A protein has these predicted regions:
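Aromatic-Pro/Gly-enriched surface loop or interdomain linker
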Residues: 1-63
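Generic beta-strand/beta-sheet core signal
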Residues: 13-15, 55, 69-70, 94-96
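Generic preference for well-ordered secondary structure
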Residues: 29, 36, 51, 67, ...
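Active-site and adjacent substrate-binding regions of carbohydrate-active enzymes
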Residues: 59-73
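A conserved amphipathic helix/loop scaffold
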Residues: 70-167
Length: 167
């Protein structure tokens, strides 16, 4: 209806500089494609009847109940600070594969992956492991039960000593 508005409670983070940097040839895998990540998430919520906004990682995220960064390979210090603020204020946040790997100059952050957000996530990638185009790995919970599969990409995660596993 003309003039009407929607108030989305879900946002997908989109940063053009990060998209461009992710898809350079020098990355560990050419299978990581921002468009695919975004469409997979968007399609899922659309089919369930949810309205979804696209938001820049530096904009105010406090109005959302759920913010998803399907991939945010390159993140400015301002974006990292803004994500911290959103999570600290109670926004639910999902961070996808190979995210917050480098700063705005494509420099690896001193201290390693997710150094500025490890305390909030309770985990970080210790090692990235791109898979072959037809490769897949099993996802298992702490009891060893199969809960899914991943194709194209895997990450070896390190948990914080006080982190609670909920999967």
């Amino acid at each position: 209806v003309v003039g009407s508005t929607t108030n989305s409670e879900i946002a997908l983070l989109l940063d053009w500089n990060s998209w461009w940097a992710l898809e350079l040839d020098s990355r560990p895998s050419t299978l990581l494609r921002q468009r695919t990540f975004l469409l997979d998430y968007y399609r899922h919520f659309f089919e369930l009847g949810y309205s979804v906004d696209f938001a820049h990682p530096e904009q105010d995220l406090s109005k959302y109940k759920l913010v998803i960064a399907p991939n945010l390979y390159l993140a400015t210090d301002k974006a990292v600070s803004n994500i911290r603020k959103a999570i600290s204020s109670g926004v639910n946040f999902v961070l996808g594969a190979f995210s917050i790997a480098v700063d705005e100059d494509e420099g690896v952050r001193p201290g390693g992956h997710l150094i500025d957000l490890r305390d909030l996530f309770g985990a970080y990638s210790e090692e990235w492991s791109p898979l072959y185009a037809d490769g897949a790995v099993n996802l298992v919970d702490s009891s060893g039960k199969l809960v899914g599969k991943s194709d194209g990409w895997a990450e070896y995660m390190k948990l914080a000593p006080d982190a609670e596993v909920v999967l």
